[in-house]
């Protein structure tokens, strides 16, 4: 049914309007009572539970940052079967993001180009919402992805990130430090070790024991990935999230004119899968065995998720395929993982 709805209705809507419609519908699951029914249909098999970051994740599969920037649909996403929800990216101050249009589908590639620009309601508002959510026993694990406020100069980034950390860390299960979005000027430069070291050190200290992971770009050279993994180990971070969106437009099926018309931004979805898997393997080789690696990028099926777990991921996230697969995507992933693991 969803493929028909996507083909005939949603694909003809502005992508951002369609996303808003979907996220609003998901946020209404709990108060409508439909969430209880959904949970009975989507609850992950107990065998899928993962213990990491000092937490129990009911499934290794969660929602990547970007889908629920302001934590308005967390409970509904949990009721759809996602084991964790990474909200954000959130910044110290509310900001509108880049001008629209800023989200573009590449349907032939099952991909998306976005240049959202960290549009969000600010860290204080997010913290208030998460404080209320933390009282709910039926909530999923909640990570908070933090980024640099656009108007803050790169040289002032440490203070900006620390301000956000102090607001959201007390109500987060873990923090993800976003230094890899291509849509905030100067942000990716923070992945340089000389800039990254003081930033991560300050965030780690401000987080006051809340697990901290750093999210990296797929466009880094292999040696740069290794150096960041070594730094994460040196600083005692909980792990690494790999990867964010890519600037590459190589090997796309979509007509080149359509891709060019979309313009600048990060590409996510199926074309990212090969590089995301390569980066995962590098990280697993370099990081300690107990470090948490969250693999994200190009995940579509249960087999995709299992291949990331087999390659060393602790957890796996998805987002873009959610737009193409629909609301029962997490249920399909969890059911597929249970079948793969069932003794034969």
Swiss-Prot record:
GO terms for biological process: 'de novo' pyrimidine nucleobase biosynthetic process; 'de novo' UMP biosynthetic process. Pathway: Pyrimidine metabolism; UMP biosynthesis via de novo pathway; orotate from (S)-dihydroorotate (quinone route): step 1/1. Its cofactor is FMN. Pfam families: DHO_dh. GO terms for molecular function: dihydroorotate dehydrogenase (quinone) activity. It catalyses: (S)-dihydroorotate + a quinone = orotate + a quinol. InterPro entries: Aldolase_TIM (IPR013785), DHO_dehydrogenase (IPR050074), Dihydroorotate_DH_1_2 (IPR012135), Dihydroorotate_DH_2 (IPR005719), Dihydroorotate_DH_cat (IPR005720), Dihydroorotate_DH_CS (IPR001295). It is an enzyme of class 1 (oxidoreductase). SUPFAM superfamilies: FMN-linked oxidoreductases. Substrate binds at residues 69, 114-118, 178, 183, 244-245. CDD domains: DHOD_2_like. HAMAP family: DHO_dh_type2. Monomer. Catalyzes the conversion of dihydroorotate to orotate with quinone as electron acceptor. Belongs to the dihydroorotate dehydrogenase family. Type 2 subfamily. This is Dihydroorotate dehydrogenase (quinone). It comes from Clavibacter sepedonicus (Clavibacter michiganensis subsp. sepedonicus).
